[in-house]
Design a protein with these regions (language model features):
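Multi-pass alpha-helical transporter architecture, strongest
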Residues: 202-209, 354, 406-432
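C-terminal transmembrane helical hairpin of 12-TM major facilitator-type secondary transporters
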Residues: 303-350
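C-terminal ends and interior cores of transmembrane alpha-helices
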Residues: 93-111, 311-327
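Cytoplasmic membrane-interface "Motif A"-like loop-to-helix N-cap segments
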Residues: 81-93, 299-310
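Central cavity-lining transmembrane alpha-helices of secondary-active solute carriers
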Residues: 59-77, 97-98, 280-293
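Glycine-rich segments within core transmembrane alpha-helices of 12-TM secondary carriers
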Residues: 151-174, 371-383
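Helix-loop-helix hairpin linking two adjacent transmembrane segments in secondary transporters
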Residues: 161-206
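Extracytoplasmic gate region of multi-pass secondary transporters
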Residues: 33-34, 237-285, 379-383
Length: 437
């Protein structure tokens, strides 16, 4: 037997490794979103029309989501053929380098149209790399976990993204407090350049994460497929489509962290620092709430918890954006933390267990990667669509709330059509005839 099987970390260590890796990886991803909302319209897209510049800047945030489906095919294939751990290293290096290079870019004023083109290229590179992060981390966590705690351990993957968001927000709070001239000339570069440290720390941590036991066993039995994607689409197309639509709940997250920040600061004149603190506190609450929702999903099932995580934000997005429109910062904190810190965390606690459990080991990472990344690609353009729907001054918030609610309800319906899997053993996942036995 392969010696690596004897060196597999305990489920707890595997989950912590995935948590830390995801946190470090998504630090890179979220700082771009924050900069796209607050800085890039002024230094990369100075059109003379603030609304047009904001839409263009937020569109570059969405461009990475277009690259994600391409990356999902490549990295999903690699994860199901060479292993989850190898893909985790590839994604970390790709994200870290692309983000660091963004921090070195000259501005539009310095090199003209070449500046936003280079920004776009690096943003695409980010999207390609991140496409395999959550699917590989969650697959590894699921496959290491005890049968009755799979949702709990898998939930640490998305809890890690909250950690990355917290880190990114806390870095941007002092940077955002700089005088406008300092922020636009050099201050915005600091979070991007710090990604070099993030990348090296992440690589040091992930070297301790061993390959999934079931993948190692499948490899030893020579059952690893050379081409998992044809098998995926031949046997699991309905499951891939269900995951795709269920992933649309991510629209709530992107509207919360990107559109709400833009609308609150640029349109309603709320304090940039206050809004960043609201995002940070919501993510701190989510950091603790997500594993608790995962524990509940192990007791009552994935689907009931998922419904709470989709239906709740579909309702709460209305008072949240309304509070921003009223410039009531206290209510913004209350509804922001309730929506994204507590209720949306139910989705995060159940999602990757439910999605991974629709597929067997040989196509699991491909299925989750392709399904989620196509869904996230649609959701990634939510901030720019919201900016267009809201009008030139971004003041018409009702269509934005409708967009978020509609996407969350579609996700809820998709999740309800999936097979409930919390009592299905690992070897029976993705095999309906065995799951019913």
């Amino acid at each position: 037997m392969d010696d690596s099987l004897h060196r597999v970390k305990t489920p707890r260590k595997a989950a912590i490794s995935s948590w830390i890796g995801s946190a470090l990886e998504y630090y890179d991803f979220f700082i771009y979103g924050t900069a796209a909302a607050l800085v890039f319209p002024k230094i990369f897209f100075p059109t003379g029309n603030p609304a047009a510049a904001t839409i263009a800047s937020l569109a570059t945030f969405g461009v990475a989501y277009v690259a994600r489906p391409v990356g999902s095919f490549i990295l999903g294939h690699l994860g199901d053929t060479i292993g989850r751990r190898n893909v985790l290293v590839i994604t970390l290096i790709g994200m870290g380098l692309a983000t660091f290079l963004i921090g070195l870019l000259p501005t539009y004023e310095q090199i003209g149209i070449t500046a936003p083109i280079l920004l776009l290229v690096l943003r695409v590179a980010q999207g390609l790399a991140v496409a395999g992060e959550q699917s590989s981390a969650s697959s590894a966590s699921l496959e290491h976990a005890p049968e009755d705690r799979r949702a709990y351990y898998t939930s640490f993957t998305l809890a890690g993204t909250q950690g990355g968001n917290i880190l990114a927000t806390l870095v941007f709070i002092p940077v955002g407090a700089l005088p406008e001239d300092a922020l636009l000339s050099w201050g915005w570069r600091i979070p991007f350049l710090l990604s070099a440290i993030v990348m090296f720390v992440g690589l040091w941590i992930r070297r301790a994460l061993q390959e999934s036991p079931v993948f190692v066993e499948e490899k030893e039995r020579q059952e690893v497929r050379r081409a998992p994607l044809p098998v995926l689409f031949r046997s699991y197309t309905p499951e891939v489509l269900k995951v795709l639509f269920a992933a649309l709940v991510s629209v709530i997250s992107t509207l919360f962290s990107i559109y709400a920040l833009t609308y609150g600061v640029n349109t309603m004149g709320l304090s940039r620092t206050s809004m960043l603190w609201m995002v940070a506190l919501a993510n701190v609450v989510a950091l603790g709430a997500i594993p608790l929702w995962g524990m509940l999903a192990d007791r009552i099932g994935r689907k009931p918890v998922y419904v709470v995580g989709a239906l709740g934000p579909a309702i709460l997005i209305w008072p949240f954006i309304w509070a921003i429109s009223q410039q009531n910062i206290a209510l913004v904190f209350v509804f922001g933390i309730l929506q994204s810190g507590i209720v949306y965390s139910a989705y995060s606690g159940a999602a990757f267990a439910l999605w991974n459990e629709q597929f067997d080991t040989g196509v699991r990472m491909s299925g989750v990667a392709v399904g989620t990344q196509f869904g996230f690609a649609l959701g990634g353009f939510a901030p720019s669509i919201a900016a267009a729907l809201a009008g030139p001054e971004l003041e018409n918030w009702v269509p934005v709330a409708m967009l978020g609610s509609g996407a969350a309800l579609v996700a809820m319906i998709a999740a309800l059509t999936m097979r409930e899997t919390y009592r299905v053993p690992l070897e029976g996942l993705g095999k309906p005839e065995r799951a019913r036995a």
